[in-house]
Swiss-Prot record:
One of its GO terms (molecular function) is folic acid binding. Transmembrane segments: none annotated. GO terms for cellular component: cytoplasm. The lineage of its organism: Bacteria, Pseudomonadati, Pseudomonadota, Gammaproteobacteria, Enterobacterales. Its main location: cytoplasm. Folate-binding protein involved in regulating the level of ATP-DnaA and in the modification of some tRNAs. It is probably a key factor in regulatory networks that act via tRNA modification, such as initiation of chromosomal replication. InterPro entries: GCV_T_N, GcvT/YgfZ_C, tRNA-modifying_YgfZ, YgfZ/GcvT, YgfZ/GcvT_CS, YgfZ_barrel. SUPFAM superfamilies: Aminomethyltransferase beta-barrel domain, Folate-binding domain. Folate binds at residues 27, 189. This is tRNA-modifying protein YgfZ. Belongs to the tRNA-modifying YgfZ family. It is found in: Cytoplasm. The keyword Lipoprotein does not apply. Signal peptide: none annotated.
């Protein structure tokens, strides 16, 4: 039987989130398999995949020749190759770009819609899953595989789990958790990713930013020691010549409408407002608060005031759960 996504509810901030099971239908899975899969991927993404163990998942960027990201990927080893999770809106163009040089390599690159992506977060998430799986991932071992299921562990903004599994297990999980967990859709996971400062690259922002403009260096997503990959020269230049002047920021406050991906905001300058930044993602929480993930200059004053264009409400900067010092 097919697996049906859960209906939406207004998302909640991590500090107040009850136990919640989410369908992650705005995210999508893809795989690379074959004898050359590690070597091929190593030449295409910013992370050092040759150093990855079975116990790790990594954030990485897949860039064009100018170092601009087609997408960012949550990578893990899968079977005899690798799998990654990215926003569904960018998967098709990202895979088309990744396949461009694959004709000379023994690899198969494909979308994977057979498996289901679920998120578990909120109050006592670990205890709830411990009743179902014999082993759970943790800080020391961030990926655990059990049967048809792969579990990924995330620390921020509060402990949570991403589950990659087959339809039968997804239905079993839903049945077991239905009584104690709230059910929600991708918007809740998106809200948690915004709070965690994990960059969200949707179609509107694909091909727009170098990885450092979205804090990937602070999230362990760029290796400056590995060999060549597409876009490496520009990514290295941004680090060693200080060419990157942008960073990912978290804003909270209120707005009469949600800004869309690719839209700019306005920064208060004395009595006036000046357009600034590019929105990556925004969500309205159940308490009415709006959270916005935006790329702006990396030297913003911490007490700066922003607004959605021409709006009467304001947004301010919230600290991210990680440091931008490399």
């Amino acid at each position: 039987m097919a697996f049906t996504p859960f209906p939406p509810r207004q998302p909640t901030a991590s500090a107040r989130l009850p136990l919640t099971l989410m369908t992650l239908d705005d995210w999508a899975l893809a795989t690379i398999t074959g004898a050359d899969s590690e070597k091929y991927l190593q030449g295409q993404v910013t992370a050092d995949v040759s150093q990855m163990t079975d116990d790790q998942h990594l954030l990485a960027a897949h860039c064009d020749a100018k170092g601009k990201m087609w997408s960012n990927l949550r990578l893990f080893r899968d079977g005899d190759g690798f799998a990654w999770i990215e926003r569904r809106s960018v998967r098709e163009p990202q895979l088309a770009e990744l396949k461009k040089y694959a004709v000379f390599s023994k690899v198969t690159i494909a979308p994977d819609d057979e498996r289901v992506l679920l998120g578990v977060a909120g109050f006592q998430a670990r205890a709830a899953l411990a009743n179902i799986f014999s082993e759970l991932p943790s800080k020391e071992k961030q990926v655990v595989k059990e049967g048809a299921t792969t579990l990924l562990w995330f620390e921020h903004p509060a402990e949570r789990f991403l589950i990659v599994t087959d339809e039968a297990t997804a239905n079993m999980l839903t049945d077991k958790l239905r009584g104690e967990a709230e059910l929600n859709n991708s918007q809740q996971w998106l809200a948690l990713n915004i709070e965690a400062g994990f960059p969200v690259i949707d179609a509107a922002n694909s091909g727009q930013f170098i990885p450092q403009a979205t804090n990937l260096q602070a999230l362990g997503g760029i290796s400056f020691k590995k060999g060549c990959y597409t876009g490496q020269e520009m990514v290295a230049r941004a680090k060693f010549r200080g060419a990157n002047k942008r960073a990912l920021w978290l804003l909270t406050g209120s707005a009469s409408r949600l800004p869309e991906a690719g839209e700019d905001l306005e920064l208060k300058m004395g009595e006036n407002w000046r357009r600034t930044g590019t929105v990556l993602a925004a969500v309205k929480l159940e308490d009415g608060q709006v959270v916005v993930q935006v790329v702006m200059n990396n030297d913003m004053e911490p007490d700066s005031i922003f607004r959605v264009r021409d709006d009467a409400n304001t947004l301010c900067i919230e600290p991210l759960p990680y440091s931008l010092e490399e």
